Regions:
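Alpha/beta hydrolase fold serine-hydrolase catalytic domain that processes acyl esters and thioesters
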Residues: 1-82, 86-103, 107-127, 148-207
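Gly/Ala-rich beta-loop-alpha elbow adjacent to hydrolase catalytic centers
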Residues: 131-136, 140
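Short glycine-enriched nucleophile-adjacent loop
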Residues: 140-149
Length: 207
């Protein structure tokens, strides 16, 4: 997937390139808890709704010394409303350490989430949506709460899929900007949710 400012590619074409690089037998050996990702990608590529969506502005920043694990991507859909997607934690220790840190301090991924949103969407006029799973959902809410007023107003929806609430940064929940975006936050958690129930919640979740 192209990085920031380096063009775009459809989900269908990205899937073709991915499976040229990685065989089914190779992927079957992957024991990571997110190893279902390639099969989900294949399903999206076969979907009339999603196969033509464009992927662009991808960033992936993982650094042990800085204690950061951050990734985000813009997805352009047919309705003309870009979706900014923040990735959650994978099975690397550095990501889990950052998760624990966000319970009592501002973490680098939160800062990067704001900078990414402002870098990608500033200077444009269209409305957009943003969201993510687990830590990604937390980052989406944080970014919308801390971005410029113009961006906050253009955020149509903020989605958190089983994302944690706020600990150290729970003062955000009392900020004027958060209160303005709060009606546009939609949080979803499974019945067996653990992470999505942690820390101070932002809105009542849909189970």
């Amino acid at each position: 997937v192209p990085g920031k400012g380096n063009g775009r590619i459809t989900i269908k074409d990205a899937t073709k390139k991915f499976f040229k690089l990685h065989s089914e037998s190779e992927l079957a050996k992957d024991k990571a808890f997110i190893n279902f990702g390639p099969q989900l990608l294949k399903a999206l590529a076969a979907s009339e709704r999603f196969q033509g969506a464009y992927l662009l502005n991808y960033v992936d920043d993982t650094d042990i010394e800085r204690e950061i694990q951050f990734a985000a991507i813009e997805i352009d859909t047919s309705d003309g409303t870009p979706f900014i997607s923040y990735r959650g934690t994978d099975d690397r220790i550095i990501g889990w350490k950052e998760d624990f840190n966000l319970s009592y301090m501002t973490v680098p991924a939160e800062i990067e989430a704001v900078l990414y949103l402002q870098d990608v969407m500033s200077g444009r006029k269209e409305n957009f949506r943003l969201g993510g799973h687990s830590k990604g959902g937390h980052l989406a809410i944080y970014a919308a709460s801390k971005a410029t007023q113009d961006l906050a107003e253009r955020a149509v929806n903020i989605y958190s899929f089983d994302g944690p609430g706020f600990g150290f940064n729970r003062d955000i929940l009392n900020s004027t900007q958060f209160k303005k975006i709060q009606p546009r936050i939609e949080k979803f958690i499974p019945q067996t949710s653990v992470v999505g129930r942690l820390l101070t919640r932002t809105v009542a979740p849909v189970i």
